[in-house]
């Protein structure tokens, strides 16, 4: 089963407006972006003593016709009493995320002017090629596909 973009938009909008996602994740911030439709989430980085946060973007892969998870890990440091956030190095990112073996992480870049400027740039992406095998391919649950996808692809970030 593949997801059509219109189905993705409908399910993502429902997910963003419901409180279910916020019960499952310790969200610091969330924004539903409408064009192109994506959900921008910020969660605390609970694996590092130095603080920081993890930035998540749920968007749509038109190639695979599946949801796509993009991730950036930010480290917070203090210099002369002023806190700053900067992108974590790849080794720190890998250690922070503790990626399950069934997921493949790669480097991706958003350069599309349709996305807000703050979302453009380098991201790690969880490759969507095996999504159907991981989430399930049952047509009878098509209307809740994104809910199942979130439970597999998103909740491990906050463990």
Curated annotation (Swiss-Prot):
* Job of this protein: E2-like enzyme required for the cytoplasm to vacuole transport (Cvt), autophagy and nucleophagy. Acts as an E2-like enzyme that catalyzes the conjugation of ATG12 to ATG5. ATG12 conjugation to ATG5 is required for proper localization of ATG8 to the preautophagosomal structure (PAS). Likely serves as an ATG5-recognition molecule.
One GO cellular component, as annotated? phagophore assembly site membrane
Has the keyword Cell membrane been applied to this entry?
no
Similarity comment: Belongs to the ATG10 family.
Query: Is-annotated flag, keyword Transferase?
Result: yes
Catalytic residues of the enzyme = 129 (glycyl thioester intermediate)
**What GO terms in the biological process aspect are recorded for it?**
autophagy of mitochondrion; cytoplasm to vacuole targeting by the Cvt pathway; piecemeal microautophagy of the nucleus; protein modification by small protein conjugation
What subunit structure does UniProt give?
Answer: Forms homooligomers.
Q: Name one Pfam family in it.
A: Autophagy_act_C
Read off the InterPro entries from this record. Answer: Atg10 (IPR016524), Atg3/Atg10 (IPR007135)
Q: Which domain of life is it from?
A: Eukaryota
Keyword line: Autophagy, Membrane, Protein transport, Transferase, Transport, Ubl conjugation pathway
GO MF term set: Atg12 transferase activity
Membrane topology category: Peripheral membrane protein
Q: What class of enzyme is it?
A: transferase
Q: What's the protein here called?
A: Ubiquitin-like-conjugating enzyme ATG10
Q: What is its EC number?
A: 2.3.2.-
Compartment list: Preautophagosomal structure membrane
């Amino acid at each position: 089963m593949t997801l059509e973009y219109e189905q993705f938009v409908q399910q993502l909008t429902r997910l963003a407006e419901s409180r279910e996602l916020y019960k499952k994740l310790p969200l610091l911030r969330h924004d539903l972006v409408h064009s192109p439709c994506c959900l921008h989430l910020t969660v605390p980085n609970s694996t590092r003593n130095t603080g920081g946060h993890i930035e998540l973007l749920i968007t749509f892969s038109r190639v695979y016709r599946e949801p796509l998870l993009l991730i950036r890990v930010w480290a917070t440091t203090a210099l002369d009493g002023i806190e700053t956030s900067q992108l974590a190095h790849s080794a720190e990112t890998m250690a922070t995320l503790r990626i399950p073996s069934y997921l493949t992480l790669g480097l991706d870049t958003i350069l599309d002017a349709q996305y807000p400027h703050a979302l453009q740039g380098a991201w790690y992406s969880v490759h969507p090629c095996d999504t159907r095998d991981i989430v399930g391919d049952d047509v009878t649950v098509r209307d809740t596909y994104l809910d199942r996808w979130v439970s597999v692809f998103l909740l491990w970030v906050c463990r």
